[in-house]
From Swiss-Prot:
Binding residue positions for GTP: 78-81
Xref: Pfam families: PapZ_C, RapZ-like_N
Name this polypeptide is given: Nucleotide-binding protein ZMO1325
Domain of life: Bacteria
Keywords: ATP-binding, GTP-binding, Nucleotide-binding
Binding locations of ATP: 25-32
Lineage summary: Bacteria, Pseudomonadati, Pseudomonadota, Alphaproteobacteria, Sphingomonadales
HAMAP family attached to this UniProt entry: RapZ_like
Signal peptide range: none
Organism listed in the record: Zymomonas mobilis subsp. mobilis (strain ATCC 31821 / ZM4 / CP4)
Family membership: Belongs to the RapZ-like family.
The keyword Metal-binding appears for this protein: no
Amino acid sequence: MSRNDLSSAPSSSAAPPARILLVTGLSGAGKSTALRTFEDMGWETVDNLPLSLLERLILTPPSSVAAYKGRPLALGIDSRTRGFTVDAFLKGVEQLRQHHSQPIDILFLDCSDSELMRRFDTTRRRHPLALDRPMEDGISEERAFLAPVREIADFLIDTTTTSSHSLQSELRQQFAPENSVAPNVSILSFGFSRGIPRNCDLLFDMRFLQNPYWEEALRPLTGLDPEIADYIEQDPSFLPAVTKIKDLLLFLLPRYIDTGKSYIVIAFACTGGRHRSVYVAEWIAARLRQAHFSLTITHRDLKLPLLESQSNRIRAGKAYQGG
């Protein structure tokens, strides 16, 4: 890859990647798992990019979406990459480091021959260098072929005794952005009367709290209004319950990191989805934000009209816990 070859590469004043990591290693050692983990951590990831396009990719402006600008970049490269030779790879890395100020590092994933054979046998896949010969021959050839890359790697991880979840945890500890302490959290409020969402990871039923729906002056309001907050907080069960829920979530969410979970939906429900579930969702969201969790909050049923079945029960004068 010569300097002249790159003369047509696009230039841009857009924010370059904050960091560039070249992810390589032995086939079956965990490159795909590593790239998925980097993507979950907010990195931009590209797999099996031809070496001749490395410089062009780095100079290409990122997506116009603000969240993509200046993100770290993880590039998956191995012996199957088009145009890959060790000499070309080493020369390309040297040139990138000369022409770019941001950190450019190499992560090499290693694994024992016996474990690689077990993994390929388990998945019933062929080793890419052993299509017409014994698997151990292909593994040995690739190991020798990539030895010079392994020698200069900035980070070396041996995955022989490492599970997929353990590898994800190790990568997060090593490479997660400084402000990344948790998976993305989505908090949802809804009403049981309109059905339970299918994507909830954790669901808390808040129908045990006193119901502002039965106060005629409060009925038109929602859990976003201070009058509703005051009413719900008067319930002696409120503070002990939400405090225990908060403590449980602060305990669980970091452990989702360790298992590689990058997205979790926490749902709070009442009957109509307008009062109790809304306020509790907001209360919990505020405490999680204080703990520096990245989250979004959605109130599914907040602006929906009262269901006909609810109206009938109210007109019949039954002790129905709506809202």
